[in-house]
Amino acid sequence: VTNSIFSPLSNPQVHRQVLALAIPMVLSNITVPLLGLVDAAVIGHLDHAWYLGGVALGSTMISVTFWLLGFLRMSTTGLAAQSYGGEDRKQLALVFMQGSLMALLFALVFLIAHTPIADLIFGWSDASAEVKHYGMQYFSIRVWSAPAALMNFVLLGWLLGTQNSKAPMWMVIITNVTNIALDLLFVMGLGWKVEGAALASVIADYSGMVFGLMCVWKTWRERQLPSPQKLLTSTHHGLGRFVKLNRDIFLRSLCLQAAFSFMTFQGASFGDEVVAANAVLMSFLMIISYGMDGFAYAMEAMVGKAIGAKDRQQLSASLVGTFFWSLAICLGLTALFGLAGSQLIAMITSIEAVQQQAAVYLPWLVVMPLASMWCFLLDGIFVGATKGKDMRNSMFVATSSFFVVFYLFAEWENHALWFAMTSFMLMRGIGLGVIFLYQWRKDTFLAQC
C-alpha cells in the first residue's frame, strides 16, 4: 500500500508539474517583502519620522482591506481550475466574468465609502496629528488603486487556474518593480514625499492589471473561449455557488486576521524589547509563508484541474508530489533556523536586548515550518476543491483554539502567544486533515466538489 501511495514520486512528470507551478509563484512572492523594504528605505530617508509613520499607517489600512478581499483570487483559482480540467470553455469564461464583476463591485463600494471608513479608523488611532495627516494623505491617493488591485486578484487566480504560473509571476514582478522604480523617481527624484509613494503604488497596480489582461486575452483566444458579449446574459449561471464560496473564504480570512492581529497587539503589552523581538521572528514566519504559499498555489491549480477532470489518479499524484517538495522545503527551513537562527536575528537587528529576547523565543520559530506545512498544503487542496464551508468551519475551530490556549497559559506571557500561534497552525492542519481523510476514505471528496 505504501509503495502504491508514493509511486508518483518515481514519475519525473509529477515533479516537473509541481515545480513548474510552484517555483514561479515562490519567486514572485520574494518581491513582496523586497517592495516593503524599498518603501521603508525611501520614505525613511526623508527628514521627519512622521512621513514613514504616515505611510505605514495608511498602507496598513489599504493592505488589510485588500487582504480580506483576497478570497477573490482563491475562489477564482479553484473554479477556473475545475472548469479547465473539465474542458468546460463556457464555464471557464464565466468564472472570469463573474470574478471581474465582483471585484469591480467591491472596488466601487470601497471608493464610495472610503472617506467615512478612513475618518473612523484614523479617529481610533493614537498616532500623532502629523502621522494621521500623512496617513490620510497616503490613503486618499492609494485608494484609487482599488479597481486594479482587486482585478489583479481575479487575473492571478484565473491564470493560475488555467495551469499558467509564469504569467502571474510576471504580473507580480512587473507590479513590484514598477512600484520600486516610481518610488525612487517620485520620492527621491521629484520630492513628492508621501504623495509620490502613494501614486507609485497606484500606477504599479494598474500596470500589473494591464499586463494580466493581455495574458488573459491571449489565453482566451488560444482556448477559443466564447466572447464576453455572448455571455452577458449568462453571468448569473453558477453565481450563487461563487458568492457562497467567497463568503465562506472571507469569514475564514477574518479569523486568520484576528489571530495575527492579536499576536501583534498582545505582544506590545509585554514591553518594547519583546514586541521588537516578535517583529523580527514574525519576519521569518513571513518567509515560511511566502515559500509555502507557492506550493499551496500549485496545489490549488493541480487539485482543481484533477477534480474538474474527475481523475482520482491525477489528484493522488498532485497531492504526493506537492507533499514531497513541501516537506523538503520545511525540513530545510527548520535546519536553517535551528543552526543559524542567532546569526539570522543579528542580520535583522543590531540591538543586543532585542537579539537576546528573540533568542529566547527562537525555538518556537524552529518548529513552525513543520507545524504549519500541513495547513498550507490542505488550504491548497480545499481551495482547488472549492470546499469553502469546510475551510470556514475548520478555521473557526483553529481560531478558538488559539485564544483558548493563550488564556489557559497566559502566565507564560509571550511564550503563551507563540504556543497559541503554533497550536493555531497545527489545528488548521488537523481540522482540514480530518475532513479530507474522512471524505477520501468514503470516496466522497471528488463527488462532493
Indicate residue ranges for each PLM-predicted region.
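Short alpha-helical transmembrane segments in multi-pass integral membrane proteins
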Residues: 1-22, 80-147, 191-247, 303-368, ...
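Transmembrane helical elements of multi-pass membrane transporters/channels
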Residues: 20-39, 141, 152, 175, ...
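Transmembrane alpha-helix boundary and packing residues in multipass membrane permease domains
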Residues: 25, 29, 41, 78, ...
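Small-residue-rich hydrophobic transmembrane alpha-helices
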Residues: 52-112, 149-168, 277-335, 339, ...
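Short runs within selected transmembrane alpha-helices of multi-pass transporters and secretion channels
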Residues: 70-73, 141-160, 168-176, 197-213, ...
